[in-house]
């Protein structure tokens, strides 16, 4: 059997959504799928990582879903899980939605032998092809060792928002906060006298 090799780089909301669509395809068993993200964000993404329970999703829980066929799937998942219990679940913390997404990635990883989770940072992506060649192969590099580079037929770039642009070169300046996530560490280095 000839396998088509697929990479999904970035496993937050978009990456998990792409994987959910791929596994529904009748030929999914003929794919070899590698998914890339760091261990902290794998399956959750930055905005939905473990963080303060004060950060609520700005949509009612019953209206959230990654499933196009069931717009209450997140709510149903929340009702059936036992890890989280909030007294007013109409608006749940963002990290709970992250756990919902991560639960599907874990489920797919347990169900499918043709899915591989790779917790290495992607350092480079390149193609090698001749002019006018439409049969591209994508190379994903997570280290300098060429033997470790992986080749793919298709590539999904789902890494979300890049880090904030710093037009005033403030990064590294005392008091400047580059990113608010995770919020429970955002103010660690800010003193009352700042």
Model-derived features: positions:
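A conserved short coil-to-beta-strand element within the FAD-binding core of flavoproteins
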Residues: 118-136
